[in-house]
Amino acid sequence: LMASNAYYNDALEKAGVRDLSGAIESLKISLRFNKLNIDARNLLGLIYYEMGEVVTALTEWVISKNYQPKDNLASRYLDEVQKNQVRLDSVNQTIKKYNQALLYCKQNSRDLAIIQLKKVLSLNPKLVSGHQLLALLYIQEGRYDLAKKSLRNAGKIDANNTVTLRYLKEANAA
């Protein structure tokens, strides 16, 4: 239990300086030590939500609520998301458009993928993975300034994301 709480506290510190990826790792370790650490699970959901990963956030909150049905902040988080139909519709559109962008990437249609990702990010501007994929496509196209802009946007959400930092290093080296 002490180890779980220590990793939870570490995650709080990391989240406080927008190291969301680092906070996620600490929270996952915390939950390995104690899967019933409701505060850790709820914070993990909040961080996923902040990173635009709404479905993953909802999953964590549902698990949390199953472990502790009463007096659980997850109930409030779930209610707030579920009663906002516009937000739920936006999440569904984001998922569809992001998956379409991935399909375009697999088909080597980078221009269509870029257009689709711009739509995704207009619906969900905090989707770190969307900014990263857009930047990767820009790097492949040799459009390094646009890649850096997209990566800076991702960095504002999650300051120490290793994928973002690796892509930024690549874009700066070009």
Language model features: what each stretch is:
Residues K28-R32, I63-N66, L121-S122, N153-K156, ...:
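Conserved structural position within tetratricopeptide repeats
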Residues S4-N5, I38-D39, N72-L73, T94, ...:
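Helix-start (N-cap) detector for alpha-helical repeat units in TPR-like alpha-solenoids
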